[in-house]
Amino acid sequence: MNYSADSGNTVYVGNIDPRITKEQLYELFIQINPVLRIKYPKDKVLQAYQGYAFIEFYNQGDAQYAIKIMNNTVRLYDRLIKVRQVTNSTGTTNLPSNISKDMILPIAKLFIKNLADSIDSDQLVKIFNKFGKLIREPEIFYLSNGKLKCAYVYFEDFEKADLAIKSLNNQLVANNRITVDYAFKENGKGNAKYGDDVDRLLNKEALKHNMLK
């Protein structure tokens, strides 16, 4: 589901208990910054809230502050709510230059190490899309002063990424034994990698509501 308002000013709130009302969401977020509007979808048949909302603030700074303060810190009916930046329907974002899409999209990012010189991006797609849909083109780069060929591969689904790791890690590909694991997070604390419980929960919700299409 895509939200047509200014994406830079809007946050996605997930893992909401259906007992939470729109008024309660408003009262919660108004404590952080002024709220312009809230979109809180209901199931058309059951008329029950679907567990997620879009909250639009008056400016991008207010939205970013809400993410910083509210994400994974507030518990409603024993559920930690998840707050992330909204992306628009064209796949672009209105984000500050120091924040990349990989930091806010709940996708499965893998780190591939020790690739053979003959392996290019198209070959990586052929190798990895056997396990599941790739959300974007692989990125190839070099470490160790250009001696170690590596890549990032982006899966839409963590379960498919798990399968790729299980099947390909420490296997020979074009006569090179490669390492396949989740990548380190750009904005993570310490050595945090993609694939933790929060990532997987957000990924399932995003897939359920077609937010990665």
Swiss-Prot record:
Write out the annotated subcellular location: Nucleus
| UniProt keyword annotation of Manganese present | no
In its keyword annotation, does this UniProt entry include Transport? no
- Its GO CC terms? nucleus; spliceosomal complex; U2 snRNP; U2-type prespliceosome; U2-type spliceosomal complex
Give UniProt keywords alphabetically. Answer: mRNA processing, Nucleus, Repeat, RNA-binding
**Where is it mainly found?**
nucleus
Q: Which Pfam families match?
A: RRM_1
Q: Which SMART domains match?
A: RRM
Q: Which InterPro entries match?
A: Nucleotide-bd_a/b_plait_sf, RBD_domain_sf, RRM_dom, SF3B4_RRM1, SF3B4_spliceosome_assoc
| Domain RRM stretches | 9-88, 108-185
Q: Which GO terms describe its biological process?
A: mRNA splicing, via spliceosome; U2-type prespliceosome assembly
Subunit relationships: Interacts with RDS3.
Other observations noted: Present with 1240 molecules/cell in log phase SD medium.
Report the protein name in the record.
Protein HSH49
The record lists the organism as Saccharomyces cerevisiae (strain ATCC 204508 / S288c)
